[in-house]
Amino acid sequence: MESLTKTEYVDAFLSNYSPNDSMSIFRQRLEQVRLDNDMLSQWIRERMDIERQYSDQLHKLAMNMQEKNNSSFAFNYAWKQLEGETLEISRYHSQIIGQIASQVYKPLIDYYTSSPQTATLRRLAERLSTVAEEMASSSVPGLKGLKKKGRDADTKSQNDLTASRATWDSDAPLAFEKLQIVDEERLLILKQVYLTIASLETDTALKQQEFFSKSMAVYSDLPIEGEIRQFMNSTSKVMSSASANKPSKSSGFHINNGKSKEEKSHGENESGGKLKNKMSTLFRRKTIMPKKDKKPSHKSNGRPNKLTAFFNKNSKASSISSAEEHPSNIDDSSIERRHYDSNHSSQIRDHPSTNNNASSYQNFNETSDEGEDNDATIRANNVRSSFLEAPLPVQPNVQAETVTPKISSKASPFNKPNSVHSEASRNTPSSIDRENASHSNPIMMHGNDFGGNFNNMQSRSTTTSPTSAVASPAPTENEDSNAAIERVANTLRKNPTISRRTRRAGTMDRYATASSDYMESNLGSLPNLSTLSLQSGPDSTATWHPEFPNSSGLSASIVEKYSGELSEDGLLHPSCSGHIFMKYTSDFNTPPPEMGVRVASEFPMSFTHLNDHAVKYGPSENTLSLIPELLLSPIKVTDFNLHLDSINGASCIPLTVVQKWKHDESSSSMIAFVKPNPVWRNLGSSLHIEKLVIIVYLGENVLVKSCQSSPAGEFSRKTSKLKLHLSNINISSSGFKILAKFAISPSAAIRKPVIEFRIRMVDSSNNPGLTKLFLKPDMFDTTSSSGGSQLESAYEETKVPTSYGIHVRECSVFADMS
């Protein structure tokens, strides 16, 4: 307001330095502002009446739905009707906000920040600053002496008022006081205009939130038993059809999980079944058991088989060095690996997307699960060291089987005869060639699935010392089952770090999955029915980089990260931190030596991690001094923290959720609707989100045995959490539906369901963020005086073109258990 009043003082002296003419012009413009305000208020009242009618219709719809029988009510019809009503309300909301911005804010800003005669204003600003200094240094108390002095000068120079500039300078303080008196009325009217607009906008936002809560309250009374029953029927059909089909050969390596019915009927007796149940109970949440192949091998000689080879694996460097020193230890499996290295080009042709998927998934895990990755890496290292110390035995009464991975390449190195192996052993490549091959072939290190990874582990285990293989001999067929269980229990007690799931060597992938066909399918096509492993979809989005607008000169990219607890009242305990990236694009001109930038925000701000190489703090608050020559490539300038309040927290999160839970003794079922937030700042017909991760869990101490969900996602028995990954999606105003069912062990733990959001999006609208950047040319302008530069900064600041990225981390939604 202070800058606007100073502008009015300047505008009053423009026309022939006559205060009377300027006052008449000012009164005319003020009447026009009053008229525009009345028209806008009438227009908003009409639209609020229309929205009130829509709210009444929604209330009638809710009452009718409560009166009808829930079992006979058509769920899809009600959802379509609600979608139409919500879309209509959001359209009116967008029109009201746009009309307020175009009819009120923009004319006021254009009027009060215009400078038609810049040179005259600069001269007048210097005079006014001189008068202000005289008023401050004068010993006469206040304006009383200046009034007297001005009246005496007015009586002496009545004939030539506009002829002498010195006379006008002596008259300036009196005119200044007159403007102050008249300006009080203008300030009151302006304050009334702004308060009216702000109250109307707040009422509109509250109405929208009330309409949304009313419309969603309709579905809080709907039973979900029918939906879950229909979901269970569809999932059982999908599983029956999936088990009848054979796995495709074009997906690389495959492992056939389980035996056929005939083998199970003939190969397992009663004691074997009991032993298998005991072993599965013993190994639960401790270690992983490799799946069995349908075709058993004929080379079962009772010796340590694939389990000992799997658990006695060494690192790649130790296998290479031992192979160099002891060439007699090289057997057929290591030769197979070398053939696999030499023929890796065919594998890369068949699987071109393997490297991209691995790298992109690694990048996303670094951004979304930073805390989990460090713990998991330590656990994986502990697992490898513990496996080398004490291998685990094999179940008795089960024949030793070997995994026969299927390879879709033309010349498979695993199907060559022994003569080829012996011939290749004579032509062993050097260690340098093997290192080059291993670095150039990421498939050899990571594998396309569990089969490829397991084969690499076998090849590494060939050079282990014979003492490690004899340390825990495999049980014979006649060994007692209780003795075998006791042996395994002792081994597990000695190695408490053995985990049920281990990460792949050298990758940040979540967990191994048995089929790559499912990974290439759509994320929402099949439900997740896995209880022992995780099904993860592809992560096609690479590491996110800041986007800059296409403009010459200085441009910026601001990434804002929000967190808090989402509730019906908005975002509780909100917090916002962000990064500011800048870039200077020169259009064949020499960039200036320094530039000033002001960071503006409605909330208190603090800078952290300032880049001292290219940026310094400015002379005033929230200002930065930049060196454009060092910003020719994008660089992160600084980090910042915003201190938010819960009043404006509702407009920070672009998504909201409505959920309903049903809890039984052994299960918990959920139905949730994820929709765009109607009070968010940039709500349109649809909302584009670059990456969305939804995490659902029942509480801290609730152990979940299995989970079924639609759409499909990842479920971890270790953390008892369900994760849904969605990339590059457009969410309409009606939103989408999530179904989930958790099977739990009956316990006394209290279930407190929580849904967490992690959102990443890039907003291309003009003014979406909480922080804005303005150029400040007066920071390095030494020609004008200090008073003039302060006055000019009110209307000479220009906004820096900026692209905004929005990240939401750890935004929790707690279920209402009442």
UniProtKB/Swiss-Prot annotation:
Residues 353-366, 403-431 have a biased composition (Polar residues). It comes from the Eukaryota. Pfam families: FCH, muHD. Residues 283-301 have a biased composition (Basic residues). GO terms for molecular function: cargo adaptor activity. GO terms for biological process: actin cortical patch assembly; clathrin-dependent endocytosis; septin cytoskeleton organization. Residues 240-251, 310-322, 459-476 have a biased composition (Low complexity). Keywords: Cell cycle, Coiled coil, Cytoplasm, Cytoskeleton, Endocytosis, Phosphoprotein. Residues 142-163, 239-374, 403-441, 456-481 are annotated as: Disordered. Its main location: cytoplasm. It is found in: Cytoplasm, Cytoskeleton. GO terms for cellular component: actin cortical patch; cell division site; cytoplasm; endocytic vesicle. Residues 7-269 form the F-BAR domain. Residues 551-807 form the MHD domain. InterPro entries: AH/BAR_dom_sf, F_BAR, FCH_dom, MHD, Muniscin_C, Syp1-like_MHD. Residues 259-273, 323-352 have a biased composition (Basic and acidic residues). The modification Phosphothreonine is found at T463. Multi-functional protein that contributes to the endocytic process, but also to events that occur at the neck during cytokinesis. Plays a role as an endocytic adapters with membrane-tubulation activity that associates with transmembrane cargo proteins and initiates the formation of endocytic sites. Contributes to the stabilization of the nascent clathrin-coated pit. Also plays a role in late endocytosis by mediating vesiculation. Involved in the regulation of cell cycle-dependent dynamics of the septin cytoskeleton by promoting septin turnover in different cell cycle stages. Interacts with dil1. Belongs to the SYP1 family. This is Cytoskeletal protein syp1. It comes from Schizosaccharomyces pombe (strain 972 / ATCC 24843). The gene is syp1.
